[in-house]
Amino acid sequence: MRPPPDPQARRRATHGRGLSAEALALLALMLKGYRPLARRFAASGGEIDLIVRRGRTIAFVEVKARATLEAAAIAIDGRKRARMSRAARAWLARHRLPADAILRADAVFVAPRRWPLHLPNAFEI
């Protein structure tokens, strides 16, 4: 019989997988011409995994890693979107942007042995 899993070890492993997924997502976005502005920005009770820019577009990116791309897409619920929106507003309050900046909330879904799927305008900020 196996001993019960250590909750802290499981949390560390999950955190490590999340960091790896974010790094892979950032690589995929950079190959598309995006430039990173921030990683793991936290404020106002929310967090944004990546904030990237390409031209006039600023994208607030949620990265989800799951066993399948479909499971990753389902993992972004209304509560997560609301928390991300609060954090995005906090980031915007701290940074001056050009008047013609285009703001988006994107998602990147990561699954094993698959290239990350970038979904622009995944939800409203």
Swiss-Prot record:
Coiled-coil region(s): none
UniProt superkingdom: Bacteria
Pfam families named among the record's database cross-references: UPF0102
A GO molecular function held by the record: nucleic acid binding
NCBIfam families: PRK12497.1-5 (NF009151), PRK14679.1 (NF011272)
Family that this chain belongs to: Belongs to the UPF0102 family.
Stored PANTHER family: UPF0102 PROTEIN YRAN
Protein name: UPF0102 protein Mpop_0474
